[in-house]
Amino acid sequence: MSYLGVGVSPGNVPVYHGTNLKVMERRMRVVELVLRFVICGLGLVAAILVGTDTQIKEIFSIQKKAKFTNMKALVFLVIANGIAAGYSLLQGLRCVVSMVRGNELFSKPLAWLIFSGDQVMAYVTVAALAAAAQSSVFAKFGQPELQWMKTCNMYEKFCNQAGEGIASTLFVCLSTVLVSCISAFNLFRLYGDNKGKSSARW
């Protein structure tokens, strides 16, 4: 293996590892950009679906209105999706500017900041999804032992729309986890580069 980043195959054909690395980095940047805008779009969709979810039901001549604020888990879900959408929009714009200028990340402080932000978003969205999913199970099936009735039997439209919002949040969660993995790679790659440069000096 040459120190110039050029390897020689068994057939004596030069292989440019540096070029392959740049291609991989470019693809990862495109994937990161797509994922961030997916989070932004689906997070906004989930927040709107749940935030506008209402249904009025008349029970014994008394009108009762179901809305997302009646369940704290759904309030958390709306807030988490809104924050994730806004954060991902800002990070997506940063990715676009970086790709247009052709420059890469990075200083280590900025890499740490992005990594930390992505980790927080992943944990927050996963927690919101878990809380909303548990509440939806109680609403759908009830809890006979605690005498909790099945509310979805009365508010079917409300539950269906909330379910659509939770489904969108599932894709948001998966995307935030993937983005956090990419940002972790981008961060620790900087330390790997420095280690390689130090070894080259010796």
Regions found by a protein language model. Name each.
Residues M1-R29, G192-W202:
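Plant-biased recognition of short, low-complexity, intrinsically disordered N-terminal tails
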Residues S2-S9, Y16, E58-K72, F76, ...:
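A surface-exposed beta-alpha-beta supersecondary segment
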Residues N20, L44, T54-I62:
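Cytosol/matrix-facing amphipathic helices and coiled-coil assembly/linker segments
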Residues L21-V23, A66-N70, E104, M154, ...:
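Helix-boundary and loop/linker segments of multi-pass membrane transporters
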Residues R29-A46, V50-D53, M71-S136, T176-N186:
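Signature of small four-pass
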Residues F60-K64, A131-G165, K197-W202:
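Juxtamembrane loop segments immediately following a transmembrane helix
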Residues K65-N70, P109-W112, Y191-W202:
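Cytosolic juxtamembrane regulatory segments of membrane proteins
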Residues N160-W202:
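A hydrophobic membrane-anchoring alpha-helix module
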